[in-house]
């Protein structure tokens, strides 16, 4: 899950920009770091359609980030909360596990 239009501090060379607009900020990963197998075998055919469904709670994912952010925990200045659900996107990709080449990517506004 990514979020767009987060306005926060950014270092731009020697200039500190306190109102920088960040886009495509990673907010959460739904499955594990390297994803998951789409099906039990690795035999795929051209134009094959595979459907997976997930039930997620945006507020639970947001709270997880707040609870595990170093900036929030130790410095009190993290930007892990206050997700704007109007600016969230889901990004899904398929990659070759052998060489890590990205084969297909799709992004959808939630």
Spans of features found by a protein language model:
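Short, conserved sequence motifs used for protein processing/export or organelle targeting and
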Residues: 1-110
């Amino acid at each position: 899950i990514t979020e767009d239009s987060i306005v926060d501090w950014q270092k731009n060379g020697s200039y500190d920009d306190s109102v920088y607009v960040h886009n495509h900020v990673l907010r959460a990963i739904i499955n594990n770091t390297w994803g998951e197998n789409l099906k039990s075998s690795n035999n795929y055919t051209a134009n094959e359609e595979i459907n997976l469904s997930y039930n997620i709670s945006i507020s639970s994912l947001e709270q997880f980030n707040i609870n595990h952010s170093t900036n929030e925990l130790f410095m009190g200045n993290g930007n892990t909360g206050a997700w704007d659900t109007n600016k969230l996107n889901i990004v899904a990709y398929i990659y070759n596990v052998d060489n890590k080449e990205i084969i297909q990517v799709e992004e959808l506004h939630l």
